[in-house]
Design a protein with these regions (language model features):
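Alpha/beta-hydrolase active-site loop
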Residues: 1-14
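Alpha/beta-hydrolase fold nucleophile elbow
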Residues: 14-26
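Active-site nucleophile loop of the alpha/beta-hydrolase fold
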Residues: 46-56, 77-78
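Short alpha-helix in the alpha/beta-hydrolase fold that links the catalytic acid
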Residues: 78, 87, 101-110
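Short beta-strand/loop motif that positions the catalytic acidic residue
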Residues: 84-86, 91-93, 97
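Acidic catalytic loop of the alpha/beta-hydrolase fold
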Residues: 96-100, 127-129
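Catalytic histidine neighborhood in serine/cysteine hydrolases
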Residues: 106, 110-128
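Catalytic histidine-centered segment of alpha/beta-hydrolase-like enzymes
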Residues: 125-137
Length: 147
């Protein structure tokens, strides 16, 4: 909800005029997908080190979640929400990410509703060092140039 309010405020103030690409990293992938799934005025979506399903992610940290409501699942389950994303999509993930497995990036990619979608698994990259790779910026530039 907050992401929509901020986006609407920026649009109403003419701060967002041309092509708009929304990017979310790690837990920020959830509000990114929330926007991209529900808005038609977004040109592109980038997910960096995003999760697919929050339950296994939380349980790997030692917390137990017994039950979620359908509303909670709809809000936080990226692998379901990404089905509604129609804009071009780039998913980037580190092959050595031990916090959020690269398998989750593959799940998101497989479930994505976008007709134009790219999955980039960067070798030798973990969860917090992706920006240090030259290929990171090359990949982003190639995607942005294609929009």
């Amino acid at each position: 909800e907050d992401a929509h309010k901020i986006f609407d405020q920026l649009k109403s103030n003419n701060k967002l005029k041309e092509k708009i690409c929304i990017m979310g990293r790690s837990l920020g992938s959830a509000p990114t997908l929330e926007l991209c799934a529900k808005r038609s005025d977004i040109t592109g979506c980038v997910l960096e080190s995003g999760y697919a399903d929050p339950i296994p992610l939380v349980e790997r940290r030692g917390l137990k979640i017994d039950k979620t409501t359908p509303e909670e699942n709809a809000l936080f389950n990226n692998s379901q929400k990404i089905r509604l994303v129609k804009c071009p999509l780039l998913i980037m993930h580190g092959a050595d990410d031990f916090l959020i497995s690269p398998h989750e990036a593959k799940l998101n990619f497989d479930n994505a509703g976008s007709k134009i979608k790219h999955l980039e698994i960067l070798e030798g990259v973990g969860h917090n060092d992706m920006m240090m790779q030259h290929s990171y910026f090359t990949t982003l530039k190639r995607f942005f140039d294609s929009l």
